[in-house]
UniProtKB/Swiss-Prot annotation:
The gene is SNX31. Signal peptide: none annotated. Keywords: Protein transport, Transport. Changing residue 440 to G: Strongly decreases interaction with CCDC22, CCDC93, VPS26C and VPS35L. GO terms for molecular function: phosphatidylinositol binding. Belongs to the sorting nexin family. May be involved in protein trafficking. Residues 1-109 form the PX domain. SMART domains: PX (SM00312). This is Sorting nexin-31.
Length: 440
């Protein structure tokens, strides 16, 4: 599936010799990721083509005449589509050519030198461990260092992830974003405009049943236990009074296995809860709290009469979704030059044999989209595993089903839409028609 890359703004810049060029601000999951020139992206594409050949998506062509504003805007759209499409191939995502270019782009954008540094990683019990890293270490590498330090089985790394987490008042926490494997945690944390933001370790799967895969690793069980306690304390998981009493008894006994077995029966166990937001049901501006997990989106909606209503959307009935940028551009001469995070996520849902759109307005729209994609991918893995079992029992019948599953894995359920008619362009955000290709 596509990653959440977008280029909402391009800027005209002058080099030391007075020449002009265009700088594209690339955002990932709604946050500034790097700034690059067309020539840099073009060179990167050429490197990728030498490795992967013609399986890459088309790259925007060079212009040898002066570009009009419309042409420049079209190029920006094409570069955005290229970044989204090229990341659909997992082989490209894991390649050295892909990762090394983006590492350098992040470091150069935020003027960070490659050197040794220390990074605090917060565990689910909100205690931290300090690790020594290189500022150019990717999230994948940092996760390996963390796992080695705490003794987590290497083969279980894929079930955990690094997140930017905001710690608020009165013990509240908010998951800001999941760090992509190729992101540099040191850079992403340092460039974040979110107050009290830390890098945290959390499990990264949406199906509570996957806990069973981790139960033979003591450290993994410790992490699950910590996160389960934290989720219950924060109100993300909602045990009944009877369940709470039993859980407290198991906690006093330090019986982690029994605690987790019961926790899996708790409502919203293993779900990720978003910050309070608004939605368009039953009317626009209705308050909502969303919990995502176990193949569903659970919404607690505040009605106009202050009563609450719980609505559950099953992922099996979600056809597609898209994230739309509704905000305005901030001052492009500021230190961060990011976006005013006004986002919506809308998904198409089947209700009584009729497809309807449900709209959620939240700054965590990209995180929500990542959770939906994760649930889809987990479902595909499960179907593939079941298909393998069927293949052993009924080889001929399973062939067609396997092909269908493989095709489904390539389906793109999500999209990013930049609603440009609603974007207020800052003074220097436009690319003027007298900029030529050699200036880029």
């Amino acid at each position: 599936m596509k990653m959440h890359f977008c280029i909402p703004v391009s800027q005209q810049r002058s080099d030391a010799l007075g020449g002009r060029y265009v700088l594209y601000s690339v955002h990932l999951d709604g946050f500034l990721f790097c700034r690059v020139r067309y020539s840099q992206l073009h060179g990167w594409n050429e490197q990728l083509r030498r490795v992967f050949g013609n399986c890459l998506p088309p790259f925007p062509p060079k212009y040898y005449l002066a570009m009009t504003t419309a042409m420049a805007d079209e190029r920006r759209d094409q570069l955005e589509q290229y970044l989204q499409n090229v990341t659909m191939d997992p082989n490209v995502l894991r390649s050295d050519v892909f990762v090394e270019f983006l590492k350098l782009a992040q470091l150069n954008t935020f003027d960070i030198a490659t050197k040794k540094a220390y990074l605090d990683i917060f565990l689910p019990n909100e205690q931290s461990i300090r690790i020594e890293i290189i500022t150019s270490d990717t999230a994948e590498r940092v996760l390996e260092v963390v796992s080695h330090k705490i003794g987590l089985c290497r083969e279980l790394l894929g079930y955990f992830g690094l997140f930017l987490i905001r710690f608020g008042k009165e013990g509240k926490l908010s998951v800001v974003k999941k760090l992509a494997d190729f992101e540099l945690p040191y850079v992403s944390l340092g460039s974040s405009e979110v107050e009290n933001c830390k890098v945290g370790l959390r499990k990264w799967y949406m199906a509570p049943s996957l806990d069973s895969v981790l139960m033979d690793c003591r450290v993994a069980v410790d992490l699950l236990y910590m996160q389960a306690i934290q989720d219950i304390e924060k109100g993300w998981a909602k045990p009944t009074q009877a369940q709470r009493q039993k859980l407290e008894a198991f906690q006093k006994e330090d019986s982690q296995t029994k605690f987790l077995e019961l926790a899996r029966e708790v409502r919203h166990y293993g779900y990720l809860q978003l910050d309070p937001c608004t939605c368009d049901y039953p009317e626009s501006g209705s308050g909502a709290v969303l919990s995502v997990g176990n193949n569903e989106i659970s919404c607690c909606i505040t009605l106009p009469d202050s009563q609450t209503q719980d609505i559950v959307f099953q992922m099996s009935r979600v056809k597609c979704w898209q994230v739309t940028f509704l905000g305005t551009l901030l001052d492009t001469d500021g230190p961060q030059r990011t976006l005013n995070q006004n986002l919506e996520l809308r998904f198409q849902y089947s209700e009584d044999s009729c497809w309807q759109w449900f709209v959620i307005y939240t700054k965590q729209a990209f995180l929500l989209s990542s959770c939906l994609k994760k649930m889809i991918s987990e479902k595909m893995v499960k179907l593939a595993a079941e298909n393998t079992e069927m293949q052993i029992e009924v080889p001929e019948q399973s062939k067609s089903k396997k092909y269908h599953i493989q095709q489904s894995q390539q389906k793109d359920y999500s999209s990013f839409l930049s609603r440009k008619s609603k974007i207020k362009i800052a003074k220097d955000d436009c690319v003027f028609g007298n900029i030529k290709e050699e200036d880029l």
